[in-house]
């Protein structure tokens, strides 16, 4: 009996827990589970506030661009103005974090209004450039010297070529006899060809008749001509 009572108590507890979970799901809306567990400590900026903040920062950053080089007072004046005049439009905005990094350079002027300090009227970089004009001229002179050096090199090479041409004259090649070396078999073939051509030409010149040429004896027409001429001489 005691065990049965124990089991019944456990079942009732389980049913009770399930009913509590079901009621919690019905009462609590679903989007409640997506709420931010760590809400922001600063008020949310509206869209108009962000537009004002952006225009204010752009205006002061433009003044920062007009500062002379190494003018700490001018630069810190612009940064302090952004921190003082712009970020009150949207307090606690996370974008102020980058400004804290920039203001580290102005730490020595943190208790002073940098805008009340005198700004530089001349730019040190421009002065350095003006002082550096002789150096620029010397650089130009160095370039001109390099060009002259290159030209002298070209003239030297040209002179060397002229000297070589003066030593080598074309008359040496014109007066020099050139010997052609021909193989013995080729010379024998050339001589036979020249002898055959000479025999043919001499035979043509000795006899006005084509029938008496030795090179034409193999032709049957010429043989018939010779027979006819022989019979004609025999008849007379």
Curated annotation (Swiss-Prot):
This protein's encoding gene: PGA43
Main location: membrane
Cell compartment(s), UniProt: Cell membrane
Membrane topology note: Lipid-anchor; GPI-anchor
Keyword Lyase (UniProt): no
Residue positions the entry lists as glycosylated: 192, 195, 198
Lipid-linked residues (GPI-anchor amidated glycine): 208
Record's protein name: Predicted GPI-anchored protein 43
Species the sequence originates in: Candida albicans (strain SC5314 / ATCC MYA-2876) (Yeast)
Entry keyword set: Cell membrane, Glycoprotein, GPI-anchor, Lipoprotein, Membrane, Signal
Signal peptide: 1-24
GO cellular component: plasma membrane; side of membrane
Keyword Lipoprotein found: yes
Propeptide: 209-236
């Amino acid at each position: 009996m005691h065990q049965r009572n124990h089991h019944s108590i456990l079942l009732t507890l389980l049913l009770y827990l399930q009913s509590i979970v079901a009621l919690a799901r019905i009462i609590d809306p679903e989007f409640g589970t997506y709420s931010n567990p760590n809400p922001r400590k600063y008020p949310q900026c509206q869209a108009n506030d962000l537009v004002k903040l952006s225009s204010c920062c752009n205006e002061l950053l433009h003044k920062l661009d007009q500062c002379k080089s190494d003018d700490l007072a001018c630069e810190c004046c612009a940064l302090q103005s952004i921190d003082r005049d712009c970020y009150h439009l949207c307090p606690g905005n996370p974008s102020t974090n980058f400004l804290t990094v920039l203001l580290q350079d102005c730490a020595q002027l943190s208790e002073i209004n940098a805008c009340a300090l005198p700004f530089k009227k001349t730019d040190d970089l421009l002065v350095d450039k003006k002082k550096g004009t002789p150096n620029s001229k010397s650089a130009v002179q160095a370039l001109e010297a390099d060009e002259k050096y290159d030209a002298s090199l070209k003239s030297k090479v040209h002179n060397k070529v002229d000297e070589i041409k003066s030593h080598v004259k074309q008359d040496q090649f014109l007066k020099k006899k050139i010997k052609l070396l021909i193989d013995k078999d080729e010379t024998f073939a050339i001589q036979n060809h020249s002898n055959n051509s000479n025999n043919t030409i001499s035979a043509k010149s000795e006899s006005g008749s084509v029938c008496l040429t030795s090179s034409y004896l193999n032709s049957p027409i010429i043989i018939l001509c010779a027979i006819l001429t022989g019979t004609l001489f025999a008849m007379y």
